[in-house]
UniProtKB/Swiss-Prot annotation:
Catalyzes the hydrolytic deamination of adenosine and 2-deoxyadenosine. It comes from Shewanella pealeana (strain ATCC 700345 / ANG-SQ1). GO terms for biological process: adenosine catabolic process; hypoxanthine salvage; inosine biosynthetic process; nucleotide metabolic process; purine ribonucleoside monophosphate biosynthetic process. Zn(2+) binds at H12, H14, H197, D278. The keyword Metal-binding applies. The active site is at E200 (proton donor). One of its GO terms (cellular component) is cytosol. It is an enzyme of class 3 (hydrolase). This is Adenosine deaminase. Belongs to the metallo-dependent hydrolases superfamily. Adenosine and AMP deaminases family. Adenosine deaminase subfamily. The lineage of its organism: Bacteria, Pseudomonadati, Pseudomonadota, Gammaproteobacteria, Alteromonadales. NCBIfam families: aden_deam.
Amino acid sequence: MNYLQLPKIDLHCHLDGSVRPQTVIDLAKLQDVTIPSFNVDDIKALMVAPASCPNLDEYLTRFALPVSVMQTEAALERISFELFEDAAKENVKYLEVRFGPQLHQKMSLNFEQIIGSVVKGMRRAEAQYDIKGNYILSIIKVLPKDDINDVIDAGAKFLNNGVVAFDLAASEEPGFCHEYIPYAKYALEKGYRITIHAGEQGVGQNVYDAISLLGAERIGHGIHINSHQQAYELVKTEAVALETCPSSNVQTKAVESIESHPFGDFYRDGLLVTINTDNRTVSDTTMTKELQLAAEKFNLTEADYFAIYKMSVDNAFTSDEVKLSLLKFID
C-alpha cells in the first residue's frame, strides 16, 4: 500500500495537541508571551511527549505551552487552518477536530468568538484544499462545570455549520459519567451528536456508562472494553464506533506495546473501529504513520483498510452528501 496516497479520515484529533512548533514561536512573539526558547527544536522537544510516558497525566502536560498562545481569534484561526492544511497534504479527506473552548479565555474572548475563530480557519482550509471538516466541543473534566451549558449554547449557533458534537476529555476517573448526565442531555436536546473519551485508562465501565447514561454514539479510545464484558457487548450490539489512536495509546501506557493493542482483535470480531491520530504534535504522528503502523502490526490488507475507511465514513458526524463524496475516493 502507498500509505501517503491513500485517502484518509481522522475522527479523533485534538487542536491543541496538533500545533506546529514554529507557530508557537511566531505567536509568542506576536502576543509577547514568555516561552522557554525561540529555537524550534527546543520548542518541539517540549511539545512532543516521550515515546513512553508513565501515564496519561504526564502526556497531558505537553498541552500547556501551545494553549498559552491560543488565546486570540487570529491565533485560533491560524492554528485551525494549519491543522487542516497539514492533514490535507497527506490526503486526509475528512477531519473532525476537537478542542476545549474553556481553555482559550485568558484574553477575555467569549465562547462564540473562540468557536467562530476555529471554524473560520477550517473554512479557509476547505476552500484551499481537498478536505472537509467539523469541530467537536470537548468539555475539560478538570475545569469547573458552571460554564458548560454556556459552551453548549455558543456552539449551538454553529451546529451543522462547523460544529457537530459534544465530548468529555482530560484524565479519566472511574464513574465520571454520572456527573455529566445533565450536560449531555442538554447537548442532545440542542442537536449535538455525542462522543466521549472513555475506556482509555483501564476503566471499561466508563464506556458502558458513556453509552447508557450519556448517549454516546462513538467512544474516544475505548480499548479497555476488552476487560469488561458488558461494555464490550454494548459496543457491539449498539454499533458504537471506537476512535482508536494506536501511537497515543502506547505513549500513555494505555497499552504496554503496539503488539498488545486490541485494535486487530476488535476489527476481526466485527466491532466498528477507526484509525486516528489523537495529537499530531504531542504524539509526533500523522495519519500516514498511524495507517502504516496499523497495517503492519495488525496485518491489514488494502481491502481491510478500505473496510475501516468505510466505517469511518459511516460513523462521521457529517451530512450524507459529504459521506457520499468521501466514499468516491475508494470506488
